[in-house]
Regions:
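Generic structural detector for well-ordered beta-strands
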Residues: 21-26, 91, 137-139
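HotDog/MaoC-like acyl-thioester-processing domains
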Residues: 1-16, 96-167
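A generic structural signal for short beta-strands and their flanking turns/coil linkers
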Residues: 16-18, 22, 30, 40-42, ...
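Short, intrinsically disordered/low-complexity patches at protein termini
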Residues: 44-46, 56-57, 84-85, 90-91, ...
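Catalytic strand-loop segment that frames the active site of acyl-thioester-processing enzymes
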Residues: 2-61
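Hydrophobic beta-strand-centered segment that forms part of the acyl-chain substrate-binding groove
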Residues: 52-61, 65-105
């Protein structure tokens, strides 16, 4: 079994308005795994009994688990491989529960040639309601001057995308 081909979008390929979408169903294993990796074992994420006594009434996913789905889009789709985070703002509007289907939308809103920076609006939605939003700034690699060109792949588009990608 071979690894999938890596498709890189270089800074020169990006345009304001390009967007990419990812869908992910939050599974119990995701929340448990995130707790293990992050060390955040707050019982609101892991204990049904404890979570039932909170204002949410049930377990919720870690906010940064939801935010990590933004990172997945930035690192694999838009801009994709080679993009490096510079900053990320996050505003949490509502909890994400186990079983929720999260749709993450990332859109290029500004390109800064000096330093090959891209600013992207990011949001996560559940049932059409924004549960998290913010902005990311990333550095994007320049197209190599010589050698074979691997570039742009089908994927990020301007405007709405038909059917989000399932993770």
């Amino acid at each position: 079994m071979s690894a999938p081909a890596v498709h890189t979008l270089y800074f020169e390929d990006l345009r304001v308005g390009m967007r990419e979408t990812l869908m992910r169903t939050v599974m119990d294993e995701d929340v448990i795994g995130f707790a293990r990796i992050s060390g955040d074992d707050n019982p609101i994420h892991l204990s049904e009994r404890y979570a039932a006594t909170t204002r949410f009434g049930q377990r919720i996913a870690h906010g940064l688990y939801t935010a990590s789905l933004i990172s997945a889009v930035l690192g694999t789709q838009l801009p994709g491989p080679g993009a490096v985070y510079r900053s990320q703002t996050l505003n949490f509007h509502a909890p994400v529960k186990i079983g929720d289907v999260v749709t993450v939308v990332v859109e290029v809103v500004e390109l800064v040639p000096e330093g090959r920076q891209a600013r992207l609006h990011c949001e996560a939605l559940v049932d059409g309601k924004v549960v998290l939003d913010g902005e990311a700034e990333v550095s994007v690699p320049a197209r190599p001057r010589e050698g074979p060109r691997e570039g742009p792949r089908e994927g990020p588009r301007e405007g709405p995308r038909e059917g989000p990608r399932e993770a």
